Amino acid sequence: MCNRFYISLILINTLLFNQPLLAQQGDYLSGEVGIGLGAAHYFGDLNTATQLNRPKPAATLFFRKYLGRYIAARAGFSFAQLGYSDIYNTQNEVQYRRNLSFNTNVWEVTAQGDFHFFKFLPQERGFNFTPYITLGAGLFSYDPYAYLNNERYYFRELPVGTEGQNSPLYPDRKMYGTTALSIPFGGGFKYSIGGGRLNLSFEVLHRFTNTDYLDDVSTTYVDPNAFPKPPGGISVAQLLSDRSGDIGAPIGLPGRQRGNGSKQKDQFVTAMVMISFNLMSYKCPSGD
């Protein structure tokens, strides 16, 4: 009886006092789930100088799966507001007189690969910080709009687009869609906090896209006869196509360049502060 009692005490002592050590020895980082908040900025036909003077809000949700100490796969779902106006192009007289503007909401899903420069072990001092780079592919939705007389108009909902889309005078110009592809590329750094359970990160992610119509501006001005004529007035599409007359003499002559002619697709960038919760595993990782 006494032997059983002593054996029980030894087992209890082993479990109580050695369990944290065993857990730490077996713990390793298997993944992260987190959120991020920050700012987004657009680059394209209305912002050819790549100015960073009109940031708008952005947010993200993500899951990261570690494939080793240095490599991880990430899935993300992000939102960004984008917009710009020619009134900010004070150093370029032609663009300033063009007087175009746009806004759009972007919803994006991405798959990315992350590479850490340092071994990242959140619970070990000296290994709880690393810079990283990331590259991936994404799909996003967008639907640009502008305001006219304090009313919002979505460009795609107009019977004829601002560059003659859907007009029989320009049969080669089809209305653009609401989805496009992106290639996100960027980097950041992260630091483990909260005893190794949380990570605080800062990341800059630039997107190259395959559309030149984030801003509804790409090719040339069109013949005013391409736009339907409402009784006693000018159509909304025609007014939004050439807004130079709002601030001076109209410059939108048919055939004159309105955008950059698709020489370079539109782009956007996000900068975010992110916090994530570490998902731990007790199975030994495949490698260091």
Predicted regions span which residues?
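Short glycine/proline- and aromatic-enriched beta-strand/turn motifs that initiate or cap beta-hairpins
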Residues: 23-66, 266-272, 276-282
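Outer-envelope beta-barrel architecture signal
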Residues: 27-33, 69-71, 107, 125-131, ...
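Residues on the lipid-exposed face of transmembrane beta-strands in outer-membrane beta-barrel proteins
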Residues: 35-39, 61-65, 111-117, 135-139, ...
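Outer-membrane beta-barrel proteins
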Residues: 42-48, 83-88, 122, 142-147, ...
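Extracellular loop and loop/strand-boundary signature of outer-membrane beta-barrel proteins
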Residues: 43-49, 94-102, 120, 169-175, ...
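Repeated loop/turn-to-beta-strand initiation elements of outer-membrane beta-barrel proteins
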Residues: 70-73, 120-121, 196-198, 281-285
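Gram-negative (and chloroplast) outer-membrane scaffold detector with strong preference
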Residues: 71, 76-158
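Outer-membrane beta-barrel transmembrane domain signature
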Residues: 139-264
